[in-house]
Amino acid sequence: KDIEQATGILSGSIYYHFKKKEEIRNILFQETAAKIVEEVSRYADCSNPYQAFMLNNFFTWYKIFHNIKYRRFFLESPIGNASLDYYIDNFYGFKKILSPEVAEKIHFSRMDLALCYGVDSGLGSYIIENYDEYTKTHDYIYTSERELTLYATILKINPEIYRSELN
């Protein structure tokens, strides 16, 4: 009935094509994910693979966190909210060891930190996949400062640049 109300299509017609709600959900998720990847890919055209990864991940999570349905799914569940609280506590503890030049640029709202949390969730896998090459020239503090500077720069951009397609 929920699907019928949301789409205006009779449930008999829907279930003629889809036997279970899960099939509909899977198709919708795949289509939504494909749209997000398509929109985000234009921001990730960078010569630096790390920055390209971070931008791609950033804008993907931005889209997720600014869509109320996705935000509820990821952050308003007890586990997601507890994970975010833990991340924020660690973030402010970590901020104390950053260089003063970087630390003074970092002023994030809870939503901004939620976005950073999502981006960071993919950072570990990126570094692991590129560990040998990455560790030749980077260390954890360098990586974190660079990442936080990137976040601060993007979050100060005129919101229309990355919010125009969200409405």
Feature map (PLM): residue ranges:
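Alpha-helical structural segments
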Residues: 6, 23-45, 55, 59-62
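C-terminal peripheral helix-coil segments that are non-catalytic and often amphipathic
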Residues: 96-100, 129-167
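Amphipathic alpha-helical segments that line or abut small-molecule/effector binding pockets
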Residues: 46-75, 141-152
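Helix-turn-helix
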Residues: 1-23, 27
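Regular secondary-structure segments
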Residues: 37, 41, 120-128, 132
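A conserved mid-domain beta-alpha-beta active-site/ligand-binding segment of alpha/beta enzyme cores
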Residues: 107-127, 138-141, 148-151
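Short, well-structured alpha-helical interface segments that form or flank functional binding sites
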Residues: 51-55, 59, 82-85, 89, ...
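Short secondary-structure transition hinges
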Residues: 65-113, 125-132
